[in-house]
């Protein structure tokens, strides 16, 4: 506002300086295309006694009672100048002159400065890059760089202002200036920047304004993929397929369709499309088959397309088919089901009766496992238990046979354990005994080998030559019966020498004879030669 006032004041001063010498008495502002009337200020009281004419910039432009009246310029009876349909060329200094009837001179009565204000017209704005919708609204993609430009025509000058009307901005003014076009830009535009953008142009002289508005939307697709899920329908025979894709603007278009059907049986014939963030489709379970593949595709106006899918699978519970328990104890059996789509409901049964939590049975679900604990097992608990899994495609079960053993049946096991321990202890004793007697056992084996490999001859020889014993001969300790110990020398004879066996035999006889004698003797085992 301050800038506008300053411009108007400047123009007025400029006009005043231009015609100051002419003593301008009035300044009039007219708008292009409108009508205006210039008053002759000092006209006589009896206007009918005088004639009037008007000059513009020193040239006569209008007289009373002209031979060819002008629609654009005309003079009233009281001397007022009426200008119809103001044009820019009408701008200038106007002088009102009067002359008495029959007189010959004209007298200037007033001088008026007429200024023509035009516009603003032709206000236009441009927002790019942007796309028009059918209703004329523009949209841009989130994260893009957007340029804004506004222009208009105005005389003598104008002020341009960009404003935005949205909930996120406290200050609606975005840009201001007097030069046309007026431009600014937004880098990495976000959803908070969407709103109604207005370009306003104001004539600095006439204060007339003109504007143009444009609604701008910021579109963006969801960042994540669609999510496919399922649940049982309102009817036991129905299953509900759920596709959701949240987080985009505007809402996407979701489509359910069958991608791959089963080899046999009727197809799902699932093709449903809707502009929404969540699309639910109810399908009768009778047309669902193991191996059917369904897909949900999300289309967004920004051009983004994403999808999710799943393949239908019948349940297949797994686990150990045999369990053994001791009577009077607790036992836990379990089964696991992970392959079914939609997820199956799994329960434990016995004899087609559903097993629920009681003081006897404890059922616990810890997905994907389902456990059954039988408390204080008895012989009556023996039998087949069923892990039953069912989903909309069908049902399957796992048979688990429970074998219950009584305490009397453990006697054989106890005896077996006792015998095993006894055999182990005997083995340990034998091993320790052999280890402690290893020297005797080894020596006995050694002598038995010597008897097999060679023939030894024992010879006892009496000797009177005491000098052959130069060193003290060690004595063996005396035996308890008091007899003297005989010293024996053993000389080995290889078993392969058999020539003098007869002589050796004679010596052996002699040796046996000598051993019968009492007293210290010397035995010598000499090899036969």
UniProtKB/Swiss-Prot annotation:
A GO term from the CC aspect: neuron projection
Residue ranges annotated as Extracellular topological domain: 21-411
Cited InterPro entries: Cell_adhesion_signaling, Ig-like_dom, Ig-like_dom_sf, Ig-like_fold, Ig_I-set, Ig_sub, Ig_sub2
SMART domains named among the record's database cross-references: IG, IGc2
Gene3D superfamilies: Immunoglobulins
Disulfide bonding pattern of the chain: 40-96, 150-199, 335-387
Membrane-protein topology: Single-pass type I membrane protein
Signal peptide from the UniProt entry: 1-18
Entry keyword Kinase: no
Glycosylated residue positions: 34-35, 46, 135, 147, 159, 211, 269, 280, 284, 330, 357, 376
Localization annotation: Membrane
Cytoplasmic domain ranges by topology: 433-529
Ig-like C2-type domain sequence ranges: 19-110, 129-217, 317-403
Main location: membrane
Key words, A-Z: Disulfide bond, Glycoprotein, Immunoglobulin domain, Membrane, Repeat, Signal, Transmembrane, Transmembrane helix
Transmembrane segments: 412-432
The protein, known as: V-set and immunoglobulin domain-containing protein 10
Originating species: Danio rerio
């Amino acid at each position: 506002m301050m800038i506008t006032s300053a411009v108007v004041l400047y123009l007025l001063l400029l006009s005043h300086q231009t015609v100051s010498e002419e003593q301008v008495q009035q300044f009039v502002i007219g708008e292009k295309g409108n009508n205006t009337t210039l008053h002759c200020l000092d006209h006589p009281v009896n206007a009918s006694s005088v004639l009037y004419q008007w000059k513009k910039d020193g040239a006569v432009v209008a007289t009373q009672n002209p031979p060819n009246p002008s629609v654009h310029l005309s003079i009233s009876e009281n001397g007022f100048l009426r200008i119809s349909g103001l044009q820019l060329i009408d701008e200038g200094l106007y002088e009102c002159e009067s002359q008495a009837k029959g007189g010959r001179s004209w007298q200037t009565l007033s001088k008026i400065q007429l200024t023509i204000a035009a516009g603003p017209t032709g206000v236009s704005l441009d927002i790019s890059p942007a796309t028009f919708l059918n209703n004329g609204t523009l949209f841009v993609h989130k994260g893009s760089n957007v340029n804004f430009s506004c222009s208009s025509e105005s005389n003598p000058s104008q002020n341009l202002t960009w404003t935005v009307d949205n909930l996120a901005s406290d200050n609606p003014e975005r840009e201001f200036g007097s030069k046309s076009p007026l431009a600014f830009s937004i880098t990495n535009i976000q959803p908070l920047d969407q709103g109604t953008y207005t370009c306003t142009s104001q004539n600095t002289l006439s204060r007339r304004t003109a504007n143009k508005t444009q609604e701008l939307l910021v579109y963006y697709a969801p960042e994540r993929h669609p999510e496919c899920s399922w649940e049982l329908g309102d009817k036991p025979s129905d299953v509900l397929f759920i596709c959701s894709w949240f987080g985009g603007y505007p809402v996407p278009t979701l489509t359910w369709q069958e991608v791959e059907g089963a080899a046999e049986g009727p197809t799902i014939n699932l093709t449903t499309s809707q502009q929404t963030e969540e699309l639910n489709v109810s399908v009768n379970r009778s047309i669902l088959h193991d191996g059917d593949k369904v897909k949900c595709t999300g289309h967004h106006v920004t051009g983004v397309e994403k999808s999710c899918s799943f393949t239908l699978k019948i349940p297949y519970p797994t686990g150990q088919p045999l369990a053994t328990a001791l009577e009077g104890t607790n036992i836990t059996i379990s089964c696991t089901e992970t392959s079914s789509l939609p997820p199956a409901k799994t329960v434990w049964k016995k004899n087609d009766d559903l097993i629920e939590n009681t003081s006897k049975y404890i059922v616990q679900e810890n997905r994907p496992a389902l456990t059954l604990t039988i408390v204080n097992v008895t012989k009556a608990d023996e039998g087949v238990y069923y892990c039953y899994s069912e989903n909309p495609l069908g049902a399957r079960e796992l048979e688990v046979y429970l074998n219950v053993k009584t305490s009397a049946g453990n006697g054989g096991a106890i005896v077996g354990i006792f015998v095993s321990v006894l055999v182990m202890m005997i083995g340990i004793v034998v091993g320790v005994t052999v280890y402690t007697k290893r020297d005797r056992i080894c020596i006995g084996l050694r002598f038995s080998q010597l008897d097999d490999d060679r023939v030894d001859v024992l010879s006892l020889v009496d000797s009177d030559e005491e000098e052959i014993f130069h060193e003290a001969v060690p004595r063996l300790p005396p035996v308890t019966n008091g007899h003297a110990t005989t010293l024996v020398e053993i000389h080995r004879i290889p078993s392969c020498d058999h020539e003098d066996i007869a002589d050796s035999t004679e010596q052996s006889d002699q040796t046996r004879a000598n051993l019968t004698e009492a007293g210290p003797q010397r035995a010598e085992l000499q090899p036969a030669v």
